[in-house]
Swiss-Prot record:
Domain of life: Bacteria
Record-linked PROSITE patterns: PEPT_TRNA_HYDROL_1, PEPT_TRNA_HYDROL_2
Species, as recorded: Pediococcus pentosaceus (strain ATCC 25745 / CCUG 21536 / LMG 10740 / 183-1w)
Catalytic reaction equation(s): an N-acyl-L-alpha-aminoacyl-tRNA + H2O = an N-acyl-L-amino acid + a tRNA + H(+)
Pfam families, per database record: Pept_tRNA_hydro (PF01195)
Database matches in InterPro entries: Pept_tRNA_hydro, Pept_tRNA_hydro_CS, Pept_tRNA_hydro_sf
Name of protein: Peptidyl-tRNA hydrolase
Annotated active site: H19 (proton acceptor)
Claim: DNA-binding is one of the keywords in the record: no
Matching Gene3D superfamilies: Peptidyl-tRNA hydrolase (3.40.50.1470)
Purpose of the protein: Hydrolyzes ribosome-free peptidyl-tRNAs (with 1 or more amino acids incorporated), which drop off the ribosome during protein synthesis, or as a result of ribosome stalling.
Gene that encodes the chain: pth
Family to which this protein belongs: Belongs to the PTH family.
Length: 185
């Protein structure tokens, strides 16, 4: 089984905000595969589907961003998901809007959702797909990540989400993560 985790904050007030990029990636993947049967389990909304016979679990933690690991670890244990079979989609302020980058491991880079997952799984060695949201120029980081994309950013962001979805679909069938990184980075 593969597990795709999208990071975000629950609540209507966070819909379409930059920090909900991971949720938007998972939602777009679900939409593409006609998945609308999310249910609540272990502080998360989950749904599953199959790709080439492989079961894939979509996960959207219902904890706030900073406590995402509390939802992820129990699901990994319950479904017996190996770290190599999990990937996390999330926003990255250090990349231009819509740019994606895949990584196999690394620090949290200041992202509190990733920091929480690292703390709960006990390692930095897990797959990630980051989608660029750019860095604030005038506003505070908190106001920026909890804000919505500017009109001129929307097209680039939507392209980034589509590229992240394509990378996640490929990830479900490609065993060599380095090949995937070469294709998308």
């Amino acid at each position: 089984m593969k597990m795709i985790v999208g990071l975000g904050n629950i609540g209507k007030e966070y819909d379409k905000t930059r920090h909900n990029t991971g949720f938007m990636v998972v939602d777009e993947l679900a939409k593409k595969h006609d998945i609308n049967n999310f249910k609540v389990q272990s502080d998360a909304l989950i749904a599953d589907f199959r790709v080439n016979g492989e079961k894939v679990l979509l996960v959207k933690p219902t904890t706030y961003m900073n406590d995402s690991g509390r939802a992820v670890r129990p699901l990994m244990d319950y479904y017996d998901v190996d770290l190599n079979d999990m990937i996390v989609a999330y926003d990255d302020m250090d990349m231009p809007v819509g740019k994606i980058r895949l990584r196999q491991k690394g620090s949290a880079g200041g992202h509190n959702g990733i920091k929480s997952i690292i703390a709960h799984v006990g390692t930095q060695s897990f797959n990630r797909v980051r989608v660029g949201i750019d860095h604030p120029t005038k506003e505070s980081v908190v106001d920026y990540v909890l804000g919505k994309f500017r009109k001129e950013q929307i097209t680039d962001f939507e392209i980034g989400v589509q590229n992240a979805v394509a990378a996640l679909e490929d990830w479900t069938t490609i065993e060599n993560f380095s090949q995937l990184m070469n294709k998308y980075n």
